[in-house]
Each structure stands twice: as structure tokens, then as C-alpha cells.
């Protein structure tokens, strides 16, 4: 078994909506990013890549490459997952924690789980997504941005 951890953060800027966990969420502010700014899928992709010792999302999809400008993070996740599977890994489970004062994530979490399960080709029971605030402390608490942490468990596929 191998465990990976991922973290991502994006500052608010411009106009919304925002995309978190593949879900378009109405909000007056957008997120500043080279891609679509999906902190949940970026953190998850990093966790998966880390567990497989394949580096991180920035190595695989550099923000200096114009090809990834405005990229759909679901596509990035699927490509990373293909590479991980090619190394002989299967998924144990993933757990994602979104850290944001606003907007409220709870109504959107079921669809996030559906999208992640679809992208990883796994059961919904293997995907957990939750959200929390920092009780108005720090940059997320002041409404300056959104952060996310994720962990992933991989196993070598049976031969």
C-alpha cells in the first residue's frame, strides 16, 4: 500500500463562478489560476501522483505550458490516473477536505463525489469529500481564497 498527500490553494480574483471537485458553483468571485482553478481536483491529483511516486501536478502539467491554460481539471485527473494505472496501481480510497469560508460546499459534495468516482473508475464508497472552515482565521477565513487537502491510498494490482 502507498499513501499520497496533496495540497492546493487558489486566491479569489475576477468574477465567478468557481469550479470545485468538477462542479460549477455559483459565486460572485472567481479563482485565479492557470487552469480552471479546481483546488479539490488539483490536491487530489497531487495525492494520487505522490502515492505513485510520479511527482506532482506541476511536473505533469506545468503552468508555464500554454497548452494547459484554462485546462479542465477533470481531464488532468483522468490523464494522471491513466499514468498511475500504467504503473500497476489500483485505488484503495481517496479523502478530500475543502477549506473555505464561502461559498458553502455541502450542497455540491454529492456531485463532486460522483465526478471523482467517474474519473477514477471507482465506486462512490471509495471517494469521500468534506468541507470545513477555519472559523474566519487565516486567508481562507478572511475570504481571500480556497484551500484543499487530499489523501489517496493506492495498492499494487494483483498480477
From Swiss-Prot:
Q: EC top class, in one word?
A: lyase
Give EC number(s), comma-separated.
4.6.1.12
Q: How is the cofactor bound, as the UniProt entry phrases it?
A: Binds 1 divalent metal cation per subunit.
Lineage top rank: taxon? Bacteria
Q: List the disulfide bonds.
A: none
The Swiss-Prot or TrEMBL record lists the needed cofactor(s) as: a divalent metal cation
* A GO biological-process term: isopentenyl diphosphate biosynthetic process, methylerythritol 4-phosphate pathway
Q: In which pathway does it act?
A: Isoprenoid biosynthesis; isopentenyl diphosphate biosynthesis via DXP pathway; isopentenyl diphosphate from 1-deoxy-D-xylulose 5-phosphate: step 4/6
Where is the site described as Transition state stabilizer found in this chain?
34, 133
* Family classification: Belongs to the IspF family.
Q: What does this protein do?
A: Involved in the biosynthesis of isopentenyl diphosphate (IPP) and dimethylallyl diphosphate (DMAPP), two major building blocks of isoprenoid compounds. Catalyzes the conversion of 4-diphosphocytidyl-2-C-methyl-D-erythritol 2-phosphate (CDP-ME2P) to 2-C-methyl-D-erythritol 2,4-cyclodiphosphate (ME-CPP) with a corresponding release of cytidine 5-monophosphate (CMP).
Protein's name according to its UniProt entry:
2-C-methyl-D-erythritol 2,4-cyclodiphosphate synthase
The encoding gene is ispF
